[in-house]
A protein has these predicted regions:
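ALDH superfamily catalytic-core signature
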Residues: 33, 57-59, 67-213, 218
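Rossmann-like NAD(P) dinucleotide-binding subdomain of oxidoreductase/dehydrogenase enzymes
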Residues: 1-103
């Protein structure tokens, strides 16, 4: 939208998991008066259509994985065009000494589990002072286990489904491998197949070994 407001035409490669949402947003913009050809949406496999988009654009804005970001940067550099990249991360939240632990837990819930944790800005690590750790864990566990997990169109639930089978297997794999290395499950750590094929319980791991990939690699 900012690109359109600045007077640019936009070609957008829609994520295959949210393609209808992107298309609807574009159609509503046209309905509101945006000229038909100013905002174009491209659908398809990124490996097939990605180069066609990046090799013909005047500027590239990419959100995705770090390996793909390197490819985009290389192709943009060869053409001497500008680009911006929002790539993988492992966002931490630090609870400071003297913090209000109830408030900190509330912030952690929204930051970690908004959109079922499927946001680039979601936190994936929590650092808590040793003297407050036990109390904070108890508060966090209580709050998480009171969350309503499910799916409805009435916004009656606090957390919903993951987007795909591939995503739930990725999440489960990270958790299972961490537990195998010695991490402890404070809460969650399991699929909720009774709710649907892609539901996974909101999960917190403690005592995660420094060697565990869940501590260093982005889960989403």
């Amino acid at each position: 939208i900012p690109a359109l407001m600045a007077g640019n035409a936009v070609v957008q490669k829609a994520d295959n998991q949210t393609a209808k949402t992107v298309q609807l947003a574009r159609d509503l913009a046209v309905e509101a008066g945006v000229p038909q050809g100013i905002w174009q949406v491209v659908h398809g496999d990124a490996a097939e259509v990605g180069n066609a988009v990046t090799d013909n654009a005047d500027y590239i804005a990419f959100t995705g994985s770090t390996p793909t970001g390197r490819i985009v940067a290389e192709r943009a550099a060869k053409r001497l065009i500008g680009y911006s990249l929002e790539l993988g991360g492992k966002n931490p939240m630090i609870v400071l000494p003297g913090a209000n632990l109830e408030q900190a837990a509330e912030i952690a819930l929204g930051s970690a589990f908004g959109n079922a944790g499927q946001l680039c800005v979601s936190i994936e690590r929590l650092y808590v002072p040793n003297h407050a750790l036990a109390e904070f864990e108890a508060i966090l566990k209580r709050r998480i286990e009171s969350m309503q997990v499910g799916s409805s169109s009435e916004f009656a639930h606090d957390i919903g489904s993951l987007t795909s089978k591939a995503q739930i297997e990725r999440v489960a794999g990270f958790v299972d491998r961490a537990v195998a290395e010695g991490a402890k499950v404070l809460t969650g750590g399991e699929k909720l197949e009774q709710l649907g094929p892609n539901f996974y319980a909101p999960t917190v791991l403690t005592a995660v070994p420094k060697t565990a990939e869940v501590l260093t690699k982005e889960v989403f």
